[in-house]
Amino acid sequence: MAAHLEEQQELDNFKYFWKTTGKWLFALLILAALGYLGYTVYQNRAASQNQEAAAVLANIVEKAQNKAPQSEINAELSKLQQSYPHSISAAQATLMAAATEFDAQRYDVAEGHLKWVLSNQKDSLIQALAAQRLGVVLLQQKKYDAALAALDTPVEADFAPLLMETKGDVYAAQEKSQEALKNYGQALEKMPQDSVGRELLQMKLDSLK
């Protein structure tokens, strides 16, 4: 992921356009140079922040692996969220924390973590994952309407089947078979043929027929 971000930043450095014509050519070239310099400084600062955030994430993972006190892990997570709220590392750490809280059946805490991710991270994949996990957390609490609302989060087409399938789960839990069948069917239709989730999804469909 870090390598991908660095490649994207390098590409973004070349995305500036200036039309330089007539007697304004020299002035525009100077403005372009200044603008490019400022943009490069901004990008370098962003790259530095991403590296710092990744270091905090690595520290969190290490503490978790070493079974450090939860208070220490939570302190590192808060530091990451406050200092680098829009970084991929902050989103990853918060998703990990949500999973831990879910496993411990602290659903309200997991819910808060996932809502934080949705509010602070705009990456399409992470948005889809957070929305899906939030739907599952709310389903576990039988907050069906809230779960469906979370699963209505706009996502890219590639990730839509994930939310559709979970919507089907919510409807199935309410014994609303027709709605569940509809969402399972739409998810299966949009899911790639080689997806590892197709078999399980087909089983869900068949169980309702």
Curated annotation (Swiss-Prot):
Query: Is Chaperone among this UniProt entry's keywords?
Result: yes
Gene Ontology molecular-function annotations = protein-containing complex binding
Could you list the residue ranges that cross the membrane? 24-42
Give the main location: membrane
Periplasmic side, ranges: 43-209
Reply yes or no: does the keyword Protein biosynthesis apply.
no
Task: From the UniProt record, list the TPR repeat ranges.
Answer: 161-194
Record localization: Cell inner membrane
Cellular component, GO, one term: plasma membrane
* Pfam family, any one: TPR_21
Its placement in the membrane is given as: Single-pass type II membrane protein
Q: Quaternary arrangement and interactors, per the entry?
A: Interacts with the SecYEG translocon. Forms a complex with PpiD.
What function does this protein fulfil? May mediate protein transfer from the SecYEG translocon to the periplasmic chaperone network via its periplasmic C-terminal region.
Q: Which family does it belong to?
A: Belongs to the YfgM family.
- What name does UniProt use for this protein? Ancillary SecYEG translocon subunit
Name the species this protein comes from: Neisseria gonorrhoeae (strain ATCC 700825 / FA 1090)
